[in-house]
C-alpha cells in the first residue's frame, strides 16, 4: 500500500481512481499528476515501482491538498462569517447558502425535525 501525502492509497485499484482518495485530488487532477510523473493511467498501484511513487509524490506536492486545503476552506468560511455577508450568515445559522427553499426540505442542513406543540383552540 503506497502512502502519498499522508494518505494510504488502495493498492488493488487503478492509479487514477486510487489518487482520488487524497482530499483535493479528483479525476482530472489525478490524470495530470500521472502524466507529469510519466505513469500509465491503467497501471494498478501494486504495480508501481519506487521511482514512479517518488515521481507521483513530487507531482502531488505542487498542489494544495489534504490538511492545507481543508484549513484554507475552513478559513474562507470563517472569513465569510466574520464579514457578515449573506453566505456567512447562512453558514452561521446552518441553512442552505445557494437560494434553496427551506419551508419543506433542507433537512440535511437544518438537522432532525424539532416538533413544536400546537396551541389549543379556544372554545366558543
Swiss-Prot record:
Extent of Basic residues compositional bias: 100-124
Pfam family, one: Ribosomal_S13
Keyword terms: Ribonucleoprotein, Ribosomal protein, RNA-binding, rRNA-binding, tRNA-binding
Domain of life of the organism encoding this protein: Bacteria
GO molecular function: rRNA binding; structural constituent of ribosome; tRNA binding
GO biological process, one term: translation
InterPro entries from the UniProt entry: Rbsml_uS13_C (IPR027437), Ribosomal_uS13 (IPR001892), Ribosomal_uS13-like_H2TH (IPR010979), Ribosomal_uS13_bac-type (IPR019980), Ribosomal_uS13_CS (IPR018269)
Disulfide partners: none
Homology family: Belongs to the universal ribosomal protein uS13 family.
Subunit relationships: Part of the 30S ribosomal subunit. Forms a loose heterodimer with protein S19. Forms two bridges to the 50S subunit in the 70S ribosome.
The protein's role, per its UniProt record: Located at the top of the head of the 30S subunit, it contacts several helices of the 16S rRNA. In the 70S ribosome it contacts the 23S rRNA (bridge B1a) and protein L5 of the 50S subunit (bridge B1b), connecting the 2 subunits; these bridges are implicated in subunit movement. Contacts the tRNAs in the A and P-sites.
Annotated NCBIfam families: uS13_bact
The protein, known as: Small ribosomal subunit protein uS13
Species the sequence originates in: Flavobacterium psychrophilum (strain ATCC 49511 / DSM 21280 / CIP 103535 / JIP02/86)
Amino acid at each position: 500500500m503506497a502512502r502519498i501525502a499522508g494518505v494510504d492509497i488502495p493498492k488493488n485499484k487503478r492509479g487514477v481512481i486510487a489518487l482520488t482518495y487524497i482530499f483535493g485530488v479528483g479525476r482530472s487532477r489525478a490524470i495530470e499528476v500521472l502524466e507529469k510523473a510519466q505513469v500509465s493511467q491503467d497501471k494498478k498501484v501494486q504495480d508501481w515501482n519506487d521511482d514512479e511513487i517518488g515521481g507521483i509524490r513530487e507531482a502531488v506536492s505542487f498542489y494544495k491538498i489534504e490538511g492545507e486545503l481543508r484549513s484554507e476552506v475552513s478559513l474562507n468560511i470563517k472569513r465569510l462569517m466574520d464579514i457578515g455577508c449573506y453566505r456567512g450568515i447562512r453558514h452561521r445559522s446552518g441553512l442552505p447558502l445557494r437560494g434553496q427553499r427551506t419551508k419543506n426540505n433542507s433537512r440535511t442542513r437544518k438537522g432532525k425535525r424539532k416538533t413544536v406543540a400546537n396551541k389549543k383552540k379556544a372554545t366558543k
